[in-house]
Amino acid sequence: MLERRYLVLEDGTYYEGYKLGSNDLSVGEIVFNTAMTGYQETISDPSYTGQIITFTYPLIGNYGINRDDFEALTPTLNGVVVKEASTHPSNFRNQKTLHDVLVQYKIPGISGVDTRSITRKIRQHGVLKAGFTDNRDDIDSLINTLKSTELPRDEVETVSTKTPYVSTGSDLSVVLLDFGKKQNIVRELNMRGCNVTVVPYNTTAEEILAMSPDGVMLSNGPGDPDVVEVAIEMIKGILGKIPFFGICLGHQLFALSQGGTSFKMKFGHRGANHPVKDLRSGKVDITSQNHGYAIDKNSLVNTDLEVTHIALNDGTVEGLRHKTLPAFSVQYHPEARPGPSDSNYLFDEFMTMMKEFKEKEQTANA
């Protein structure tokens, strides 16, 4: 017989369902993701650190989970909410069920709830604090706890690598600042022959320049970009000296370093089907996104940044490029995983930028 579990929101709303995953109950910011597949990559994305994910697709876990498709070694989210969790996955690569993996990593979850209702509430009222309890009598107490709980805004230190390491390639060298990187960023660079050195989020400009890389990338990551001040100062120190490419949180930090400002979105962009328009070509890409903060377009007016991409759903800034220096960024995930590969060409643009900058430097020093 399935045991009861309750998902409780800070506004007093609660949903009765069934236990899924760990008995180590937790609280977090509840968000929703609209992707139909890719749940393994989603739950292992460090950008979800501290959050509780509501999957809008009604059946999650139907093709199981395997050891190769994790985007980080250890998932760091605080909970999973699904309409139905598959107990009998069918796929030749399947090794574990969703429930087994959630238990393994001490992540609580709930199934059998109306995920459409939860999603509508988040969409209408914005993200809320939420938590789980297995005892109906504890709901009122949990509501009070949620109201008084201050969720952390800075989760980058939790998920960033503590020591540098190298993913070997044979061509250009790239330093990747790890704010909670997805592994597929490294894969995309390695596929293009790059030698990738992954370094902690608080690595200084001087330390990066001492490595003499051909380019620098800033990864995705969780939390509020305003609190990662050390990275903002680092960007100021390398800009113009090395080609630069930022993704997601890296995009936001790039904008902040040049005088832009960020804001917390009502419910964010999380899914694998977000249309983005390239203002230079008019082309529309379907993109994978996962962010709760965005850059204020009006704050960029008197900066050296130009907006290159916008979200077609709400007009928010999705891409930036420096007007004179070799640096650009996107708010979405060109490496996908999960999601479409429409924007993989951005890695090729970064490769071209690095090669042209290197040739220019060599010519100048000849």
Swiss-Prot record:
GO BP term, example: glutamine metabolic process
Protein name: Carbamoyl phosphate synthase small chain
Binding site for L-glutamine: S47, G221, G223, L249, Q252, N290, G292, Y293
Active site: C248, H333, E335
UniProt-listed SUPFAM superfamilies: Carbamoyl phosphate synthetase, small subunit N-terminal domain, Class I glutamine amidotransferase-like
PANTHER family attached to this UniProt entry: CARBAMOYL-PHOSPHATE SYNTHASE SMALL CHAIN, MULTIFUNCTIONAL TRYPTOPHAN BIOSYNTHESIS PROTEIN-RELATED
Region of interest (CPSase), residue spans: 1-171
